[in-house]
Amino acid sequence: MSYKQYFDSLPLKLKSFFQRYPPSIKYSPVSTSTKAINANPFLPNKHPVTQRFHDPKYSLRRMSDVYKLALRYGVEEFLPPIENTKKLFFEEKYNKKTLMKGVLLPKGHKHELKLNEKLKKREEALKKVDELIASKKGSKYAKRVEKMKKNQSIGWF
């Protein structure tokens, strides 16, 4: 496939971008004069007479659209450099992503944190409940509980 055929297979948005900003020109990675040939269309550039910065020719949204299309068609290396922008794309975005504190291992609410301790206390209390009731009701009740336990045990095994 020749370069001409490959260029014709690109989407209209990419074609128009490369016609307006040909990849043969080495674009500046930093802001330059608006009249300079190598003025980067993705960066704000300074007007030589007024010394004021002009907005970039392509906004961040349009730059992102062009970059994503170029990435899909494998021609992103022909785009002007965008290193000093804070915009990250695709793999870079997910590789450099820092997770918020507590996302991987969430701390939980107070009632969730104390749940295991609470269940252990409950089990211990259930084991000691007969002794507690016997101490409050007296020895007569304690003897009755012991008889009930003996009768409940199955001895025919």
Swiss-Prot record:
GO terms for biological process: mitochondrial translation. Pfam families: Mitoc_mL59. It is found in: Mitochondrion. InterPro entries: Ribosomal_mL59, Ribosomal_mL59_dom. One of its GO terms (molecular function) is structural constituent of ribosome. GO terms for cellular component: mitochondrial inner membrane; mitochondrial large ribosomal subunit; mitochondrion. It comes from the Eukaryota. Keywords: Mitochondrion, Ribonucleoprotein, Ribosomal protein. Component of the mitochondrial large ribosomal subunit (mt-LSU). Mature yeast 74S mitochondrial ribosomes consist of a small (37S) and a large (54S) subunit. The 37S small subunit contains a 15S ribosomal RNA (15S mt-rRNA) and 34 different proteins. The 54S large subunit contains a 21S rRNA (21S mt-rRNA) and 46 different proteins. Component of the mitochondrial ribosome (mitoribosome), a dedicated translation machinery responsible for the synthesis of mitochondrial genome-encoded proteins, including at least some of the essential transmembrane subunits of the mitochondrial respiratory chain. The mitoribosomes are attached to the mitochondrial inner membrane and translation products are cotranslationally integrated into the membrane. Present with 1550 molecules/cell in log phase SD medium. Belongs to the mitochondrion-specific ribosomal protein mL59 family. This is Large ribosomal subunit protein mL59. The gene is MRPL25.
